[in-house]
């Protein structure tokens, strides 16, 4: 019994003490530029664009919680469209790698590409089917939503190999189905999930 108690005390003493939440805040951002060319006869066009700029704040609370808020400004539009707009605003409980809970407005776990960061896409944008199906720029006549929605999601990494790399990742969420910055208008929810073998 004494050995068990000593082990528990040693383990709790070794846990990393959480920094105050305000000391973990990070400011980041990026600007994406674009060049488009169309050589169709009668419809020739070529142009440089400032596609978008994003500014993000993120941080941790008590080591177990991660949060993020991100704004987007669209570039080279005559009216700025729906810009500036809030694209991410969420908190995620991350105590365990195998079971995390996220709530707020964030990327839907639909398709392989949608959850990926735009910078990880390289020079190419998302494929046309992903931009349509995940709700980037066509939502059956509804607003564009950058592949995001408001909801709650569980996710985790399973079956780690000898080097600690997860072999399976899963995500399952319930979302309003209306896109970003919009309440649920039809009272029906989207249930979206996936499992990735890596």
Each model region followed by its residue ranges:
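Outer membrane beta-barrel
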Residues: 16-38, 42-180, 185-192, 196-198
